[in-house]
Amino acid sequence: MWRGSSAGGSQGAAMEGTGGELGGQGNWGLEDAPGLLARASLPIMPAWPLPLASSALTLLLGALTSLFLWYCYRLGSQDMQALGTGSRAGAVGGRPGGCSEAGRPSPGRSGESGEGPRTEGLMSRRLRAYARRYSWAGMGRVRRAAQGGPSPGGGPGVLGIQRPGLLFLPDLPSAPFVPREAQRHDVELLESSFPAILRDFGAVSWDFSGTTPPPRGWSPPLAPGCYQLLLYQAGRCQPSNCRRCPGAYRALRGLRSFMSANTFGNAGFSVLLPGARLEGRCGPTNARVRCHLGLKIPPGCELVVGGEPQCWAEGHCLLVDDSFLYTVAHNGSPEDGPRVVFIVDLWHPNVAGAERQALDFVFAPDP
């Protein structure tokens, strides 16, 4: 141990004593420095007892965790409220203005966008809720659709004749009539089920005279001469109608592209009486394709979609993109009887699987 000293030893004696304080008297060396420094720092920063510091840190972390969980709960509650009120806010149907070809009423005038900015904001909130639960992967087109909303008037559609009322998914191939090969499996399944579906219609049919109320299961006419019996309405199964139409329900269960869990999805019988006409309408979205299976097609019936005329054929399917302006008419005589088709909403073949999942979440039917 190094000690301070002087030639006569008097300096060493002066350093000896009983005190150990820095600057006082006593024996000290290099090994005593840590203790001296610690004692010197006590008046500046008193050390907390270890148990007390640990308890304070635990309480702080607990408070931060509780605050984070509360924030997540509030955020999730707002999203679920938006999801719960979406379709009740007119998310799909728009304003009732006439009878669409199977399903909820289409907008009263072509291009009418229903809720406008309110619907656009609701869709964006739902999409963010979906992304938080799953992922944004593959959501480019859906995000653009949510940000842009439907096109009023002649916006992003083809030459202004494609005007979906609610959802316009960009970059989808567009044509008024879709080739059968695009949905070959579902088309062939429905056509092979034609006899069973026709029998089901005979079992639930009535005289359509208009002098008596429609029987159970049939919707009241939303336009003169237009009647519907739906097995699926806005993505919700109608159990009583499905039990009355087992052949049609079995065919629906075998389809691969049926929009069965989406408010854009409908399926059922559509009846048009002689003299009835539905003109200048557009469906709510270009993300679907409507499959028309002809059941009873008398002379004088016509379907014009996007300016292109077509006609149904009994036992055969016609694929229609009803986001284009369309007109349906029965110009036959009363003796010809009604025109009857079985209509099913299928996914557009170019909507990817991830996009379908997201749109099913965003446009989920009411519970």
Curated annotation (Swiss-Prot):
The keyword Transmembrane applies. It is a single-pass type II membrane protein. The modification Phosphoserine is found at S106. It comes from the Eukaryota. One of its GO terms (cellular component) is membrane. One of its GO terms (molecular function) is dioxygenase activity. The chain crosses the membrane at residues 50-72. Keywords: Dioxygenase, Membrane, Oxidoreductase, Phosphoprotein, Signal-anchor, Transmembrane, Transmembrane helix. The keyword Zinc-finger does not apply. Its EC number is 1.14.11.-. It is found in: Membrane. Residues 1-49 are cytoplasmic. Residues 1-27, 88-122 are annotated as: Disordered. InterPro entries: Asp/Arg/Pro-Hydrxlase, Asp/Asn_beta-hydroxylase, IPNS-like_sf. It holds the Pfam family Asp_Arg_Hydrox. It is an enzyme of class 1 (oxidoreductase). Residues 73-367 are lumenal. Belongs to the aspartyl/asparaginyl beta-hydroxylase family. This is Aspartate beta-hydroxylase domain-containing protein 1. The gene is ASPHD1.
